[in-house]
Amino acid sequence: PGASAEEAFAHMVAVLAPLEDPHVSLVDPATQRSFSGGAVPRIVSQALAGLPADADDDAQAAALAATVDTIVRAREGYLDAPAETPIPRVLSAGTVGGRTGYIALDALQLRASLDFPDQADTLAAALDQVLAPLHDLPALILDLRANGGGSDRLSVAVAQRFATRALRVKKRVYEGGKLLDPRTIEVPADAHAYRGELVILTSDLTVSAAEVLTLLLAGRPRTRRLGDTTAGAFSDALYKTLPNGWLVTLSNERYEDEAGHSYEAEGLAPDVPTPAYSLVQLEAGHDAALEAALALVAR
C-alpha cells in the first residue's frame, strides 16, 4: 500500500526473477515497462559483450541479428551445397562429405500466431522436401541449437519424420489449484521415417517446443544429443491480466518423459556435453559443436 507504480513493478520483478523462467514476464502497457525471465543464453551474452553499457534496443537488436548471420554462415560453410528450402529462415539443409545429412531447424513457428492452421502442414511438406535426398544416408545431424520454440503441433510433425518407433511424452497442466492427470502426446511409428543414426545439437537457446521435440526424439533408438543443456522451459506460457492492467505470463505445465521425469527448470542434458557456440570461433568460420557431431557419426 502506498507504493508507486514503479516501486510496485520493481517488487513484482523481485518476486518473479528468481524463477529464472523464459516464459515468465511482466509488462506495463501504459509505460511499456517490461521484464522477461530466464537466464541470458551464453551466445547472447557474447553478442552483447562488446556493446557500451548504455547501448539502446536498436543497437542490441543489430548485434543479435549480426550474430544470427554469423551462426548461419559458419554452419553452412560445412555443407557440400545448401539445399533450397521453401522456408529458408526457418529450415536449412544439405550434406557434409556426401555421407552425412544436416538439417538446421531454427523455429517451430512459421507465423506470428501459433494457431495459424496450416503451419504443421507447411513445415511437414518442407521437411519432406529436404529429407528426400538425405533419407538413405547413414547419419543425419538435426541442429536445434538456435530453435526458440513455437508450437507443439510442429514438434510432433518433425518427430514424425524420425519416428522409427512410437515416441511419447506426458503433459500435465496445473489448473484450479492442482496438477491434473497427465495427457500423453504420442507420435506413432512411421514406416517412412528416417532410420539412420541421428545426432541432435542443442544449446541453452533450445527452448519450449524445441525442448519438447528433443524430449520426444530422446526415445528414438540410434539417437544421441550433443551440445549444451537445453533452457529448461518446456511449459507453454499462461497469460493473465492483473487488475491494474499489467500483463503477466507464467508457466503452468510439466512435460515428462516416459519414466515420469520432468526437466522443467533443469533442462535436458546432452549425451555428449560440448560447448554449443563460441562467437569468436564462429566469426572465424569454425563451428566446434558441428565438427564434434561429424566426428561422432564418423566413428
Can you annotate each of these PLM segments?
Residues P1-L140, L144-V173, L179, L238-T241, ...:
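Flexible, low-complexity junctional segments that flank or bridge functional domains
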Residues S208, A218-R220, G227-P243, V248-L250, ...:
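C-terminal soluble interaction/assembly domains
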Residues E264, L268-R299:
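Low-complexity, Gly/Ser/Thr/Pro-rich intrinsically disordered linker/tail segments
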